[in-house]
Amino acid sequence: MNVYFNPLDKACKSITGGVRQGDKLQFNIFYLKENFTRGEFFSLRTPLWGECETPASEATLSLGKDGEERSLYPLRKTSYGWTISLKINEIGLYYYNFVIDDFYLTMGKGRFGQLSGEKKPEFQLLVFAEDYTTPDWFKGGILYQIFPDRFCKVGNMPDIAGRIPRFDWGGTPSYKPDEKGKILNNDFFGGNFKGIQSKLKYLKSLSVSAIYLNPIFEAASNHRYDTSDYRNVDPILGTKEDFQNLVVEAKKYGIRLILDGVFNHTGDNSVYFNKYGLYPSIGAYQSKNSPYYSWYTFQEYPDKYNSWWGIDILPEVNEESESYQEFILGENGVLKHWLSYGIGGYRLDVADELPDFFLKKLRTTVKTANPEAVIIGEVWEDASNKIAYS
């Protein structure tokens, strides 16, 4: 039996990609004439309709949510094969295949359908919420990523204890462990907000519509994924006023700024953990009576604690802590604080390591403050079927 089904072809699946909750979706399977191969169809570019015929076999759609039982839906025979139209009213991640006689039409190479005796691999279908929208300004735009320390420097770099200034702009940053086996990443080349602002005209010439900035919050390292203070910009980058000026000037060029939100972990050298006592606060490492103690999980206090992938300079945050949720997601929290500067949204670091409940609350907070803000989650694997680890 020779059939054709490709979920990326609108002739086979009326809506490619994800489907909005309640929208009508049509599947078509084409029954090709005997001895006519899919390869010939593509090489000859033969009109598909002329190479199909009405099948004798019956076909059934097997469809169900991830981890749940599949439901069966009979397909209707047509002059070209089989068809079915349906609406899915519940959001979620679904998987499906087709049953034709004693064979399963499942996902083959290149995501084409293939007939076999095995039920898997199944095709995937994401059904998203009816009211979900992508802001118009973000559609079809060009997103330009900037690593702030190395993009552009204007003016002198401030002298800050514990940070090594670099004056060889094109040099290789220090990345090897020190004598204690620590990778400090504490050499800085001095890229800053004013430097980015000086390049806005250039970025506009590239048709850039949004800039994604790697972390800008105060931190001990040059990559700044070890947040020290969520409410302050890193002093090497400039001041809050410098950042506000950058946001305002970027908008004049039709460019919006997207900030990197690192909410799965903080730095050990931070207001909140304060492992080295460099901040005036009482950090979680210093006392169980710290207002931040509930933010972290200790196995043996204070030196054994959960950290991001076992890297002890990045103590992992307990997102279930009501205190932490209020600090990040609350009315006077971090998210709304930076949205008030006019940013275009957030890119979430290791989004798949944030609990679903936290992500939902985060989205509500951001969209309540600015419905036009975007939220982008970092996922290293296939993001289309990603479910949070915790």
Regions found by a protein language model. Give the residues of each.
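Hydrophobic faces of well-ordered beta-strands that scaffold small-molecule active sites
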Residues: 142-144, 211-213, 257-259, 346, ...
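Non-catalytic scaffold segments within catalytic domains of secreted glycoside hydrolases
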Residues: 380-390
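Glycan-association/targeting regions that enable binding to alpha-glucans and other polysaccharides
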Residues: 1-141
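Short, surface-exposed acidic/glycine-rich loop or hinge patches that mediate macromolecular interfaces
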Residues: 216, 322, 352-353, 380
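Substrate-binding/active-site clefts of carbohydrate-active enzymes
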Residues: 147-209, 216-341, 362-369, 385-386
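Catalytic metal-binding/acid-base residues of hydrolase active sites
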Residues: 262-264, 349-351, 380
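Conserved, well-ordered alpha-helix/loop/beta-strand core segments that scaffold catalytic motifs
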Residues: 338, 344-347, 351-353
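Acidic-and-aromatic substrate-binding clefts and catalytic sites of carbohydrate-active enzymes
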Residues: 235-237, 351-357, 382-384
